[in-house]
Amino acid sequence: MKLSVSEKIRLILNRKNMTVGALAEATGQTRQNLSNKLSRSNFTEKDIEEIAAALGCEVEINFKFPDGTEI
């Protein structure tokens, strides 16, 4: 089962004992705005990069073909 981007972010927040409010502050947005994005799993690539940086993580985006080839 694949996790959504929001689920992955929440897992990392939990692992780091960090709140959504703290992440919102670290990424320069309101807690409400980030909560809305998390509830809809609606992020731009820039959002994800900023969140990853605030969490001390790297982001890797790959495209996978049906034959298993990745780019």
Predicted stretch roles:
Residues 56-71:
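Short C-terminal boundary/hinge segments that cap the last helix of small helical domains
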Residues 5, 16, 44:
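Flexible coil/turn residues that form the inter-helical turn or adjacent wing/linker of helix-turn-helix
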Residues 13, 24, 52:
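The alpha-helix within a helix-turn-helix
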Residues 17-32:
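Short alpha-helical DNA-recognition segment
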Residues 10, 35-36, 49:
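Key DNA-contacting residues within the recognition helix of helix-turn-helix
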Residues 40-53:
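Short, basic-rich loop-to-helix N-cap that marks the start of a DNA-contacting helix
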Residues 1-3:
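A detector for short, charged/polar N-terminal pre-domain segments
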Residues 28-43:
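Recognition helix of helix-turn-helix/homeodomain-like DNA-binding domains
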